[in-house]
Amino acid sequence: MTPTNVKTRFAPSPTGRMHLGNLRTALFNALLARSRGGRFLLRLEDTDESRSSGAHAQTLMADLRWMGLHWDEGPEAGGEAGPYHQSERGAVYERYYRALEAADQAYPCFCTERELELSRKAQRAAGKPPRYAGTCAHLTAEERERRRAEGRRPTLRFRVPAEETVVFHDLVRGEQRFPTDEIGDFIIRRADGTAAFFFCNAVDDALMGVSHVLRGEDHLTNTPRQLLLLRALDLPQPEYGHINLITGDDGAPLSKRNGSLSVAELREAGWLPEAVLNYLARLGHHYTGEVESQLLDLQGLADAFRTDALGRAPARFDRHQLSHWQQLAVHRADEATLAPWLERLDDAVPADRRRALLAAVRDNILFPDDLAAWGQRVFGPLPALAPDTEAVIRDAGPAFYEAALAELETTAGDFPALAKAVRKATGAKGRQLFMPLRAALTGLCRGPELGPVYALMPVDIARCRLEQARELAATTP
């Protein structure tokens, strides 16, 4: 296969917000396509009418665009293999259903859910894995008509060939073997006439020219069923790779309870898409060499992407690692990227000083809320001081702050000049000079370089804080 023939896809169901697991699946497929000069397709699997909605579909596509994952083919992008909403492909599926029935490779099943559950219970009681018992596999035409006359609405089941073994090479897990006798005939059309996942997912991949499918390992047992379907329909079979699942700190599958976030929540909190992409690209995929620690754009991530570097062990979500990439992304971000953060600042921060504030504290913030907190520290009343900050102020003593107040007017906005004057007046130097000034002016013992921060601080606010520090230093704990 030449690189230009590679086509991957992301095929979500638009039934709710997109979370990290689905986002990583989309990313890996996009990276695989771009790493080989191929195409990335988006298909919306919206056959579940009770849960799918147009609003969810629009949100999902907006999330992908925000992350920079633009599809080459699919909804709104067009393409020759559409439509790309499964809800619009009923006639396509019906054609292949008829072909399977004509070849006696599919049959109507009239079993009720209660009958199926009783059968499964009996199989478990006998120590056998539950699978369809074949109750309707060989009904005569008369028996089928009688059941229809009783008002039973049949599903359509695929007839799985007996005594075979489905063998395929998984791009992540190597050779996989599944005896067909352990599969059982499975539903390909629901009783309401809608297409079941096994069927429409496989047929659409084939008809849309998808060559490679990366999806979660929870789909591994679906693959032999889909390969059997494609073989029966004489349709091309893609190469499959089943990636590891993401788990939380507790080792359980990632969920809202143990740390999962939706893309919408990430965006609202101020996570930058570059940070999320760089973290997820390394969550279950190992980059080597210089690129391992570099913040890369999408093409850079794709250039170093390899399916043989995809891991099999569960990928544990690590928020600290995600924060590391956020720090790199914030440091590298241009003014336009962080402009929305400025708009979220409190009115107390003068509009003409917002960019300077961002520049002063950029290396010490990760999110818009962090910037807002620094806006408060520079232009508003300080929050309550931590015990270690109070201790620094008391250790400096009231005379230290009296000296600072005496020099305030002549050194307004010029921290080096203020520090020099206080040093001359008190003899303090090093940590004994800078730490008490930082503690009094910002309410913290550590933070960004104090010069740019002090240059932004109004003189009356600086005076008030030095006076408060003088009063605190004169008290005993």
Swiss-Prot record:
Organism, scientific name: Alkalilimnicola ehrlichii (strain ATCC BAA-1101 / DSM 17681 / MLHE-1)
Catalytic activity of the protein: tRNA(Glu) + L-glutamate + ATP = L-glutamyl-tRNA(Glu) + AMP + diphosphate
Binding-site residues for ATP, renumbered to this chain: 256
InterPro entries linked to this entry: aa-tRNA-synth_I_cd-bd, aa-tRNA-synth_I_codon-bd_sub2, aa-tRNA-synth_I_CS, aa_tRNA-synth_I_cd-bd_sf, Glu-tRNA-ligase_bac/mito, Glu/Gln-tRNA-synth, Glu/Gln-tRNA-synth_Ib_cat-dom, GluQ/Sye
EC numbers: 6.1.1.17
Superkingdom as given in the UniProt entry: Bacteria
Name of the protein in its database record: Glutamate--tRNA ligase 2
Residues holding Zn(2+): 109, 111, 136, 138
GO molecular function (one): tRNA binding
HAMAP family: Glu_tRNA_synth_type1 (MF_00022)
